[in-house]
Amino acid sequence: MDKKLYISDVTLRDGSHAIRHQYSVAQARRIAIALDDARVDSIEVAHGDGLQGGSFNYGFGAHTDIEWIKAVASVVKHAKIATLLLPGIGTVRDLRAAYDAGARIARVATHCTEADISRQHIEYAREIGMEAVGFLMMSHMQTPRALAEQAKLMESYGATCCYVVDSGGAMNMNDIRDRMRAFKDTLRPETQTGIHAHHNLSLGIANSIVAVEEGCDRVDASLAGMGAGAGNAPLEVFIAAAARLGWNHGTDLYRLMDAADDIVRPLQDRPVRVDRETLALGYAGVYSSFLRHAERAASKYGLKTVDILVELGRRRMVGGQEDMIVDVALDLCGAREFASSASGRADLI
């Protein structure tokens, strides 16, 4: 492959979920320096849930988005700084503040059926000189053709790149292949495509490779897979695989390997890996950032995290419905108490 892959690191945004949004500015700077030295193309910086994500619903960050962005902007020399915005959480004013702090790429994220709510934010990003990227979360919940039509809307608003986003880590290689082909068939030739994979079924690397085979231009990944659920496609692993395939990625593999093991992995207060709980996310098709919230609810109410996650999947809950996790836990408690009571009555008969 002759074309240069665009390597988009998400350690300082999606990776924030893995440590409950507690990066210090010093840690953000150190990670950014390592990534910049390794020559990634962009570094995404924000609360895990995007600009203004710090809240009771999603969890408060150790710093504000602007503090993190300024910290990274003060040290990077090569990579562009990206940030993420979810309409309804962040506003155009937040985009302006991020731009003033040093961000130059606005990744506007919506649920995969709601691209129409991105119009104001994509148009504003272009107006102030930012690159605008459309980010269709939970892409497994739409058919390939319907998803491509949502991407077409984002393109019409001014997005120059549109992403297939496997937020639940629920897709396999055929799912990715079908969606990338639909994008290529529907979008203009000059509109780039991207893949954002999660590793809940251990397919983050495989899915990213398949996406590139189908013409994908940009690949999201993170050091040590740092991200929600079982994490994102591990950046250093993807680069090693890409190198073995002879692809032009333009990064320094060994610097990335060192950064993953020496800087990022020691920050994890819960291992970012495929285990019982994160596997349940992928199997049930649940938004990966629900993991820590579900674990907290399970501990509080004496439930199994897997039971909560599977029920969330059955109800088709999506990003932004974190407040419903407690409701699901209470419903499961009620069902447990009813079953216990019914069993007790049966014993008396």
Swiss-Prot record:
GO terms for biological process: catabolic process; L-leucine biosynthetic process. It catalyses: (S)-4-hydroxy-2-oxopentanoate = acetaldehyde + pyruvate. Disulfide bonds: none annotated. The active site is at residue 17. It comes from the Bacteria. Residues 5-257 form the Pyruvate carboxyltransferase domain. Substrate binds at residues 13-14, 167, 196, 287. The keyword DNA-binding does not apply. The record marks 13 as: Transition state stabilizer. Pfam families: DmpG_comm, HMGL-like. GO terms for molecular function: 2-isopropylmalate synthase activity; 4-hydroxy-2-oxovalerate aldolase activity; manganese ion binding. InterPro entries: 2-IPM_HCS-like (IPR050073), 4OH_2_O-val_aldolase (IPR017629), Aldolase_TIM (IPR013785), DmpG_comm (IPR012425), DRE_TIM_HOA (IPR035685), PYR_CT (IPR000891). Mn(2+) binds at residues 14, 196, 198. Its EC number is 4.1.3.39. Keywords: Aromatic hydrocarbons catabolism, Lyase, Manganese, Metal-binding. PROSITE patterns: PYR_CT. Belongs to the 4-hydroxy-2-oxovalerate aldolase family. This is 4-hydroxy-2-oxovalerate aldolase 1. It comes from Paraburkholderia phymatum (strain DSM 17167 / CIP 108236 / LMG 21445 / STM815) (Burkholderia phymatum). The lineage of its organism: Bacteria, Pseudomonadati, Pseudomonadota, Betaproteobacteria, Burkholderiales.
